[in-house]
Amino acid sequence: MEPIPASRSTILLETADPASEAARACLQAYYDELARRFESGFDVALSRDPDAADMRPPRGSFVLARRDGLPVGCVGLKGHGGELAEVKRLWVAPAARGQGLARRLMQCVEQTALQLGIRVLRLDTNSSLPEAIGLYRSTGWVEIPRFNDDPYPDVFFEKTLHDAL
């Protein structure tokens, strides 16, 4: 994937290995924020796919957002082989919030999913993240019943993708 420049911004999106140093830095910042915001804390070892191994080609993808070369956001696409996948680990650094970056990351992961033949995306989140829930609802995600046994999420969404994203 070629870097995608942001309009009126220096933030670029690029695919990355989730095990790369920049990706690990974003993921650790994400985990630290969840630990602060969740009443019960957060331990990535208790979540599904703690090492993000399924967020790699050919079934998945991991996207980093960089400003001046530094990571400021990320999102993962966890493919299951077939037309269904999960969006995981959406995070934007506090200094980069309020600029539409989370929306851009979600658009990028949806486009990638379509390129991989994925037609239905699911995601889970926690009610302690109302800004994420608002983003999902405003971009066409529909709340669905629980679809996994991960201990942290309590809100679940699904979106059917169409070729004209």
Q: Residues of each region from the PLM?
A:
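Active-site acidic-Proline motif in GNAT/NAT acetyltransferases
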Residues: 93-95, 99, 127
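Short coil/turn segments at alpha/beta junctions that flank glycine-rich nucleotide-binding fingerprints
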Residues: 83, 99, 115-119
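Actinobacteria-biased recognition of intrinsically disordered, low-complexity terminal regions
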Residues: 1-5
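Loop/helix-junction capping segments adjacent to catalytic residues or to phosphate/diphosphate-binding pockets
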Residues: 21, 99, 130
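Conserved GNAT acetyl-CoA-binding A-motif
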Residues: 106, 112-125
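Residues forming the Rossmann-fold NAD(P)(H) cofactor-binding site
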Residues: 99, 103, 107
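Acetyl-CoA-dependent GNAT
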Residues: 9-88, 93-94, 106-108, 112, ...
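C-terminal "cap" of GNAT-fold acetyltransferases
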Residues: 7-8, 26, 119-122, 126-139, ...
